[in-house]
From Swiss-Prot:
Binds cyclosporin A (CsA). CsA mediates some of its effects via an inhibitory action on PPIase. InterPro entries: Cyclophilin-like_dom_sf, Cyclophilin-type_PPIase, Cyclophilin-type_PPIase_CS, Cyclophilin-type_PPIase_dom. This is Peptidyl-prolyl cis-trans isomerase. One of its GO terms (biological process) is protein folding. Residues 7-170 form the PPIase cyclophilin-type domain. PPIases accelerate the folding of proteins. It catalyzes the cis-trans isomerization of proline imidic peptide bonds in oligopeptides. It comes from Solanum lycopersicum (Tomato). Pfam families: Pro_isomerase. Belongs to the cyclophilin-type PPIase family. One of its GO terms (cellular component) is cytoplasm.
Length: 171
């Protein structure tokens, strides 16, 4: 079976920035890929925290040029929240795939076994993250849109304009 593809339609400062299409590695990380896929479609409804289990309307709260764009905190919006479709947090599935370069999609965490809904898209090779963060997909179209998002980031991670997932889903 082919790996699923999902999309984000991003806005930057309220203006449409374009579509990012990602392939999810369901073949190597089925549980992690399924979590992200379902959070793109919103099909699981409302989570334990009372918020929709959906990336739609959430922001990239941390964008560091030359490193990565991080998002997925749809409960708090600032990097302290998020929730998986499995409940609060889930374990690191495996570290088969590596942080080989721009476009790699990986889970953000707060240490081993703390995966929720936060993720990041690499804008560079980040091999020091291998064995610490689960790589579960890659950007297949729209890396130019990620570059636009990267351009409003800063070394602190704060964005000069909000980068919002205006719409998302499965293709």
């Amino acid at each position: 079976m082919a790996n699923p593809k999902v999309f984000f339609d991003l806005t930057i400062g309220g203006a449409p920035a374009g579509r990012v299409v990602m392939e999810l590695f369901a073949d190597t990380t089925p549980k992690t890929a399924e979590n992200f896929r379902a959070l793109c479609t919103g099909e699981k409804g409302v989570g334990k925290m009372g918020k929709p289990l959906h990336y739609k309307g959430s922001t990239f709260h941390r964008v560091i040029p030359g490193f990565m764009c991080q998002g997925g905190d749809f409960t708090a919006g600032n990097g302290t929240g998020g929730e998986s479709i499995y409940g609060a947090k889930f374990n690191d599935e495996n570290f088969v795939k590596k942080h080989t370069g721009p476009g790699i999609l990986s889970m953000a965490n707060a240490g081993p076994g703390t995966n929720g809904s936060q993720f990041f898209i690499c804008t560079a090779k980040t091999e020091w993250l291998n064995g610490k963060h689960v790589v579960f997909g890659q950007v297949v179209e729209g890396m130019d849109v990620i570059k636009k998002a990267e351009a409003v980031g800063s070394s602190s991670g704060r964005c000069s304009k909000p980068v919002v997932i205006a719409d998302c889903g499965q293709l």
